[in-house]
């Protein structure tokens, strides 16, 4: 008899894919170049519709840790993932995408000061809160941190504001930080009425 079927060797080669645009990332300044590899997203050109295949990255790092200079994220160890990944090849093993770093909030908090009317103005002090790990007031430069009040004399009782200042900046972006005033600064300086003979208070 003559067989009406036959078998022969056959192979299916992997379909070549190329990476498309990489989705941009952003983060708040933390003093490092670390980026989130789990957020890596890139379109794959030439994949069969319906197949389960994506690209993933083993690592991610910004090109610079500073707000003003960070504009790119490098992704090493790019590879295919998914149930159908074995049917595809990807020539690229690295990728780049846009990346931005936004300023970190740095809150200037004035220490509460209280005096009796007519007494000399006190020395105003306070602290800066919100530094990235490993950083402190030394990153503010030679200008340092100062606090001041607009009060020029102490004859009128009441609550007054105290403003933190780094150089000339009281509210706005300074390097990697966005300078903000603590809510309590608006009433951080209190002038109490002086007592008069007979237990009365001066107005």
Model-derived features: positions:
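Short loop/turn motifs that initiate or flank beta-strands
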Residues: 1-203
